[in-house]
A protein has these predicted regions:
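A conserved short coil-to-beta-strand element within the FAD-binding core of flavoproteins
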Residues: 1-9
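C-terminal, flexible cofactor-proximal segment of oxidoreductases
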Residues: 98-183
Length: 183
C-alpha cells in the first residue's frame, strides 16, 4: 500500500522506492449512470455493448465512449482487447450510432462498429508531448505542436477554436496548468 509520494520517492508500508519517474495509475470506474441500466457490465462498471454499440436487451439504447466495454473484432489496429475510454473512440462511436439510428428509421440493417485507430498523443509538460501515429513515435516540441494543431482542428467552429487557442496561449504565457484542457 502506498503511504506517500514525493518528487523522487514512493513510500510503501515497509519500504521506499526511489525513482526519477513516478506514474500513478490508480484505476478508473465508469460513470454512476451505468448503474441505472440493468445489463451486463465489466469489473469497472462499463456496459458491455453489442457490435453495433447497442445495449443487449435494450435494442433502442446505445452506449458509447468510456461508458462502454467494446471488444473490437475487425479493427485494423489489433492492439486493444477492449477499446480505451478516449475521445477518438467516443467520437467515432457517436458517428456510428447516429448512422445506426438513421438506419433504424429507414428500416436498414444495422452495421458493426469498426474502430479506426488514428494514433495516440499526450501532453507531458510545457512545450512537451508524445505522439504515436502510424508506428511513428516521437516527443518534444514538435509533438506538442502537433497535439495543439490536432486538438484545435477537432473543435467545431472558428469562434470556439479562437477562444480555446487564446486560452491556451494565455495559459502558456502565464504557466497555468489547466491551459491544455479542451472544453
Amino acid at each position: 500500500i502506498v503511504k506517500n509520494i514525493q518528487k523522487d520517492k514512493v513510500f510503501l508500508e515497509n519500504s521506499v522506492i526511489e525513482s526519477e519517474s513516478i506514474f500513478w495509475t490508480a484505476g478508473i470506474q465508469a460513470s454512476p449512470l451505468t448503474q441505472s441500466i440493468d445489463c451486463d457490465k465489466d469489473n469497472l462498471g462499463r456496459i458491455i455493448v453489442k457490435e453495433d454499440c447497442s445495449v443487449p436487451g435494450y435494442e433502442n439504447i446505445f452506449a458509447i465512449g468510456d461508458l462502454t466495454n467494446f471488444k473490437p473484432k475487425n479493427n485494423l489496429s489489433k492492439k486493444y482487447e477492449t477499446l480505451p475510454g478516449v475521445a477518438q473512440v467516443a467520437l467515432q462511436m457517436g458517428k456510428h450510432v447516429s448512422k445506426q439510428i438513421q438506419n433504424d428509421l429507414n428500416n436498414v440493417e444495422r452495421k458493426t462498429f469498426n474502430y479506426k485507430d488514428l494514433g495516440e498523443m499526450a501532453t507531458i509538460g510545457k512545450s512537451k508531448a508524445v505522439v504515436d501515429i502510424m508506428n511513428l513515435r516521437f516527443g518534444g516540441v514538435i509533438a506538442w505542436l502537433i497535439w495543439l494543431f490536432v486538438h484545435l482542428i477537432a473543435i467545431t467552429n472558428f469562434k470556439n477554436k479562437l477562444m480555446i487557442f487564446t486560452q491556451w496561449f494565455w495559459g502558456y504565457l502565464t504557466s497555468q496548468r489547466h491551459s491544455r484542457i479542451i472544453r
